[in-house]
Regions:
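Cytochrome P450 core scaffold surrounding the K-helix E-X-X-R motif
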Residues: 85-92, 120-130
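Reverse-transcribing Pol proteins
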Residues: 1-93, 138
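A general structural signal for short secondary-structure junctions and capping/turn motifs
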Residues: 5-8, 67-69, 101-105, 113, ...
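Conserved P-loop/Walker A NTP-binding site and adjacent catalytic elements of P-loop NTPases
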Residues: 133
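Conserved catalytic palm subdomain of right-hand nucleotidyl-transferase polymerases, strongest
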Residues: 71-85, 97, 101-122
Length: 138
């Protein structure tokens, strides 16, 4: 059931829409403590191997990235996309009230909760959006 490979959403690729007249943002890389350099290198290699990351030579866009060690010995790979987020067109989406959701569940016998490991990595971006999500490492 769980073979360690990354599943992919089979629907359409996601397109990030930017506001009009924005300029690209290219950050400087965050410094990485020497003690974490090898761990970061291994994590990048792993993400390249499973198809999450792809090496490129240059880009107008770049978000700084770092890792946070977890208690279990693995790391959390974090990219700071706050500057990109400021440039994205917002698509209003009404969040339903909990009370309304509970009313819809009345009479159901089962409830399921799903948690996607590495959730955002399951959704492919269209080629133009991939360029926006470029990361920079030291």
């Amino acid at each position: 059931m769980f073979d360690g490979t990354l599943g992919t959403y089979k629907g359409s690729e996601y397109k990030i829409e930017l506001k009009e007249g924005i300029k690209p943002y290219h950050a400087k890389p965050f410094p990485i403590p020497r003690i974490h350099e090898e761990t970061l290198k291994k994590e990048v290699e792993r993400l390249v191997k499973i198809g999450v990351l792809k090496r490129i030579n240059n880009s107008e866009w770049a978000a700084p990235t770092f890792i946070i060690p977890k208690k279990n010995g693995t790391v959390r790979f974090i990219s700071d996309f706050r500057e990109l987020n400021k440039r994205i067109k917002r698509k209003p989406f009404p969040i339903p009230k909990i009370q309304d959701l509970l009313l819809k569940l009345e009479g159901f016998k089962y409830a399921t909760s799903l948690d996607l490991n590495m959730g955002y990595y399951h959704i492919k971006l269209c080629p133009k959006s991939r360029k926006l999500c470029t990361i920079v490492l030291p």
